[in-house]
Amino acid sequence: KTKKTTLCAGNIATAEAAKFLIKLGVDIVKVGIGPGSICTTRLVAGIGVPQLSAIIEVKKGVKNKKTKIISDGGIKYSGDIAKALSAGADAVMIGSLFAGSLETPGKLIKKNNKLYKSFRGMGSVGAMNKGSADRYFQTKQKDTSKYVPEGVEGFVKYKGNVKSIIYKLIGGLKSSMGYLGAKKITFLKNKPNFVKITKAGFYESMVHNVDEVKNESKY
């Protein structure tokens, strides 16, 4: 490592891994093993930690303010961004929420009079055929039928311009900060109070007892 180079390494899910990387001189650690919507690592390898728990655990290993934490994956709603930042992340990486936007490279496809965009995980066969096999130590495997994928390919609804998506995500984050009285994003980390909820509590948190939702929000 040189002073002019910023190093980012991952993905990890434990405090021990964070300490190990920091000793090597890493400036940024990425947290997340299997939380992505198109990732199958937890099914294929049996490895992974629920994302919020992983962030909290990694934060225990990051004692200095210079080392930053990026939460990679698991963002389904704007509220998940607030939770990740409150748990200790300095930033989040978002994939699936942006996958259906105009700016993404996926092909625009029409199915049943609805528009979709193709979306694939870096561990999918399609992505490995395009060069991501090295991430999974499978570059020596010339027979692509023998790839062991840790991701899938699929389609997501077309969402239009990415600006509208970002606008709603920022709005949700601001709303969360307002509820918590946090004037700055950094204030979210001031002893957050996380509460475990039951399945009934989760159901109550979602839209319910409604047959049809008009002007559905993307949260």
Predicted feature descriptions by range:
Residues 1-4, 14-16:
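Phosphate-binding glycine-rich loops and their immediate beta-loop-alpha structural context
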